[in-house]
């Protein structure tokens, strides 16, 4: 790319096809891992593997990034993953931050909600950011990694696999060539070519409704909130969603009904009056992008097929209500990359990848359930359902119990893998949400004189968190803690102390001051408490007192060396 990060028009960039030396090799070149698809999921997976030192090849059949109406809502958990990949700050700096949402029935506000009601978190509940910016920032991060190669205009046209590996037929503007690989990650979207070549399908429910997306550039004084209308006077008997993107662009979704003509509804003479009815005829705006879509909630039966792993839209799909598509895809990458990295390094058995399948199938089912419920509430299919919905909305203004029933899209939250075989079950009493399998939560900390965030000190490796009391650690305790870094799968050690304290004789260990006491509070920790986090920042074990043998056993379990390979749900 020739444009700078500050002024790149990511929708206009074209990436030149370049002939690879693999195309001139006398025999097919073998790669350890090949990823198909340079969208957010493929790029995130490739960056994660490359950061682990795994030489990675990424193939894409196009020569440009996404354009127009794609994902725009990126959740707090996804931003934390982007932090770990080295580009989260760029997303937040560019994106429109929001925590608040409002729901209207007709033209009356029913209630508002705050998706991040407590302070002390490094990121907001959501940012709105066009997908082409997300892809652009990920791509620029990828280009910083010398062991990550991207080949544009390389299309997968054939695929065969055996127990020993995979052979790919690749089409380019200069003809076809063959590649071999140990593992293939299919992140090539809802119309996955890899899935088709294997004769696999996604099954589920297609919803009989149509929606119009209008991305509108305008100067407006709307607050940076998510506004959702049921049956508004400017668009009767349907729903409308409005929220802001960067660059003065606003996303407006209009429900149209199944009988709407998708071609006619995209025409400006249809779109402009709808937008004017919402904004007022005096508001000046330009149409940036218009599309009409239908959607389905579906998934593959399983996400691991031999040596092929499916992630993102190639594996599962949901309705747009709740921003669960791109966010769940990035969380697929987060779950997959550390496991595949350990397998490729010989530090874990191949059966560890079975837990990618079981954990992320479980997450997909959660997302599909929530997405389906949202869709059923937003688009009632009969008079009884509509009567229930409208009565709920009428009550919600004054009755808190009814607000819990209003569903304008249950917004994306990460899954807790409570039944994962990688967890070591509690033997001590704990309170709170940080159970084994839960995504770790954030809190403010201080390192030396620098204020920072707890989660930014974790990830990319197993992390041990010891809550100290500021007193001198015994030689035996310190030696046992330090031994974790010498295990076959090393553990990065963090010591958490109360504000203003310093643990003594801890050499170069990272000492985190719990400046507001929120780390201890959110993890229900006391002096001596120890947590073990996975490389994807999910809790896998915790104890009230440190026991080196127990931690080493938990580490073996979390890397697939103990117990079964599949979670039961």
Residue positions per predicted region:
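Helical substrate-recognition/capping region of FAD-dependent monooxygenase/halogenase enzymes
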Residues: 2-36, 51-52, 105-108, 136, ...
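FAD/FMN-dependent oxidoreductases across multiple families
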Residues: 10-12, 246-248, 262-328, 348, ...
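Core beta-strand elements of the Rossmann-like FAD/NAD(P) dinucleotide-binding domain
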Residues: 29-31, 174-183
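Glycine-rich Rossmann-fold phosphate-binding loop(s) that bind the pyrophosphate
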Residues: 38-39, 131
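Glycine-rich FAD pyrophosphate-binding loop
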Residues: 50-70
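Active-site-adjacent segment of FAD-dependent monooxygenases/related oxidoreductases
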Residues: 67-143
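Conserved FAD-binding catalytic core of PHBH/FMO-like flavoproteins
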Residues: 109, 140, 145, 183, ...
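A conserved short coil-to-beta-strand element within the FAD-binding core of flavoproteins
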Residues: 152-166
């Amino acid at each position: 790319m020739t444009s700078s990060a500050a002024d790149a028009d990511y929708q206009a960039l074209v990436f030149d096809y370049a002939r690879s030396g693999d195309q001139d090799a006398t025999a097919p070149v073998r790669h350890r891992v090949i990823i198909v698809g340079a969208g957010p999921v493929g790029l995130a997976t490739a960056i994660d593997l490359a950061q682990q030192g795994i030489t990675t090849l990424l193939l894409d059949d196009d020569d440009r990034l996404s354009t127009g109406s794609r994902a725009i809502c990126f959740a707090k958990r996804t931003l934390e993953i982007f932090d770990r990949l080295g580009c989260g700050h760029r997303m937040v700096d560019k994106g429109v931050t929001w925590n608040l949402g409002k729901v209207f029935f007709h033209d009356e506000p029913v209630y508002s909600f705050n998706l991040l009601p407590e302070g002390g978190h490094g990121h907001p509940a959501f940012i709105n950011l066009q997908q082409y910016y997300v892809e652009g920032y990920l791509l620029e991060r990828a280009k910083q990694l010398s062991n990550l190669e991207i080949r544009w205009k390389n299309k997968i046209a054939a695929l065969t696999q055996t127990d020993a590996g995979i052979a790919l037929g690749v089409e380019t503007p200069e003809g076809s060539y063959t590649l071999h690989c140990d593992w293939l990650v299919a992140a090539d979207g809802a119309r996955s070519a890899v899935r088709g070549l294997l004769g696999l399908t996604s099954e589920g429910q297609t919803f009989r409704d149509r929606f119009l997306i209008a991305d509108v550039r305008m100067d407006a004084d709307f607050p940076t909130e998510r506004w959702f209308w049921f049956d508004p006077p400017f668009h009767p008997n349907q729903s409308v969603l409005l929220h802001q993107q960067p660059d003065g662009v606003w996303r407006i979704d209009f429900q149209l009904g199944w009988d709407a003509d998708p071609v006619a509804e995209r025409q400006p003479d249809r779109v402009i009056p709808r937008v004017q009815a919402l904004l007022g005829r005096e508001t000046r705006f330009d149409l940036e992008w218009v599309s009409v879509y239908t959607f389905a909630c579906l998934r593959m039966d399983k996400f691991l097929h031999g040596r092929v792993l499916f992630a993102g839209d190639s594996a599962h799909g949901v309705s747009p209500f709740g921003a669960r598509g791109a966010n769940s895809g990035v969380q697929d990458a987060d779950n997959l990359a550390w496991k595949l990295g350990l397998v490729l390094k010989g530090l874990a058995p191949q059966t560890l990848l079975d837990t990618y399948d079981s954990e992320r199938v479980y997450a997909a089912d959660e997302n599909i359930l929530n997405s389906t419920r949202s869709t059923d509430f937003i688009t009632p299919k009969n008079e009884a359902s509509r009567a229930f919905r409208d009565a709920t909305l009428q009550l919600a203004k004054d009755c808190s119990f009814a607000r819990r029933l209003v569903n304008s899209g249950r917004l994306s939250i990460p899954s807790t893998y409570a039944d994962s075989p990688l967890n070591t079950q509690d033997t001590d009493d704990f309170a709170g949400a940080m159970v084994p399998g839960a995504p770790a939560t954030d809190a403010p900390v201080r390192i030396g004189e620098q204020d920072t965030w707890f989660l930014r000190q974790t990830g990319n490796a197993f992390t041990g968190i010891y809550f100290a009391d500021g007193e001198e650690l015994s030689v035996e305790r310190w030696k046992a803690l330090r031994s974790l870094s010498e295990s076959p799968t090393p553990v990065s050690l963090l010591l958490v102390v109360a504000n203003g304290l310093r643990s003594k004789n801890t050499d170069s260990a990272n000492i985190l001051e719990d400046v507001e006491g929120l780390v201890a509070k959110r993890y229900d920790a006391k002096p001596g408490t120890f947590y073990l986090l996975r490389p994807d920042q999910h809790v896998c074990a915790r104890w009230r007192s440190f026991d080196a043998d127990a931690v080493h056993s938990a580490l073996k379990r979390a890397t697939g060396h103990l117990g079964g390979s599949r979670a039961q749900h």
